[in-house]
């Protein structure tokens, strides 16, 4: 496994009091960032890349509430990775934010795509952050050459 490169963006402090959308292009490291910055306080974590989880949520978005109630979760952090795959879950998230002290971290590749679909973006109940490809201070110690940067860009997966 490759070494994790510490990112400048700090999602942990933003999640102390409010839910958060974390948007960014594919392969910019959203899932890796979460795995490396958010360890404590996570009560439930779903990836909608998991076909079984995605199909259950598409068939009945209420399974999110059922899972939270079954586990007795009333506060803490719930992570839903790739929320754009089942945007119908956002209505459940909205209600759960209103009814509980749960904070949500929702990742996706495109806020624009969600807006175009006319889905609930939680009306101010969640902050928004964008994760971009690496910036120079994050990779300076790796001593990348200008040639490599121009050839491959600064996306973590490359």
Give the residues covered by each predicted segment.
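Phosphate-binding site recognition
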Residues: 1-158
């Amino acid at each position: 496994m490759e070494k994790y490169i510490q990112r400048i963006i700090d999602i942990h402090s933003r999640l102390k009091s409010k839910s958060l959308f974390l948007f960014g292009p594919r392969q910019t490291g959203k899932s890796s960032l979460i795995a490396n910055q958010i360890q404590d306080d996570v009560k439930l974590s779903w990836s909608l890349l998991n076909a079984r989880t995605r199909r259950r949520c598409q068939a009945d978005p209420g399974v999110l509430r059922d899972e939270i109630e079954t586990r007795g979760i009333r506060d803490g952090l719930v992570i839903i990775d790739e929320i754009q795959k089942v945007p119908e879950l956002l209505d459940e998230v909205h209600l759960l934010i209103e009814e509980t002290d749960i904070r949500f971290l929702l990742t996706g590749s495109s806020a624009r795509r969600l807006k175009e679909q006319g889905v609930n973006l939680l009306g101010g109940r969640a902050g928004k952050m964008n994760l971009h490809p690496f910036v120079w201070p994050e990779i300076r110690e790796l001593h990348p050459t200008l040639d490599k940067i121009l050839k491959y860009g600064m996306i973590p997966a490359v």
